[in-house]
């Protein structure tokens, strides 16, 4: 899982992820932004579910993050729409609406994000 952190002209951090993990980047860009307390909550949840049968989920404005002891799933909340709610002929490109990755890989990105943000 490759990633890149950039700063826009306003100094805001933008995350770009490799193909198949784009939604992870969107989650950082839309849900985390500068809200490092959300990352605290996610890391605490990861410690809680790691090595257990439990899972944890947090619905955000645009994306929901779900994790169990081994993997993390981030999905666009728009995926909750049933087929009848979408306009005829419309469908969502799931690869850009859903990403799965390993817990350890995800936590490495979280740590790298924190480090990048702290170098303001």
Curated annotation (Swiss-Prot):
The record, for Pfam families, names:
UPF0231
TM regions (residue ranges): none
Query: Where does the secretion signal sit in this chain?
Result: none
Name the InterPro entries for this protein.
UPF0231 (IPR008249)
What's the family?
Answer: Belongs to the UPF0231 family.
NCBIfam families per the UniProt record, alphabetical: PRK05248.1-1, PRK05248.1-3
Q: What is the name attached to this protein's record?
A: UPF0231 protein YacL
Q: Which organism is it from?
A: Salmonella schwarzengrund (strain CVM19633)
Q: Which gene encodes it?
A: yacL
């Amino acid at each position: 899982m490759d990633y890149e952190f950039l700063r826009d002209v306003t100094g805001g951090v933008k995350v770009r992820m490799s193909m198949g993990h784009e939604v992870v980047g969107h989650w950082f860009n839309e849900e985390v932004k500068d809200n490092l307390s959300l990352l605290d909550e996610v890391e605490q949840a990861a410690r809680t579910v790691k090595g257990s049968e439990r899972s944890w989920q947090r619905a955000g404005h645009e994306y929901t993050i779900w994790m169990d002891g081994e993997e993390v799933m981030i999905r666009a909340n728009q995926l909750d729409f049933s087929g009848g709610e979408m306009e005829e002929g419309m469908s969502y490109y799931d690869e850009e609406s859903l990403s799965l990755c390993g817990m350890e890989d995800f936590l490495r990105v979280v740590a790298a994000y924190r480090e990048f943000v702290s170098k303001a």
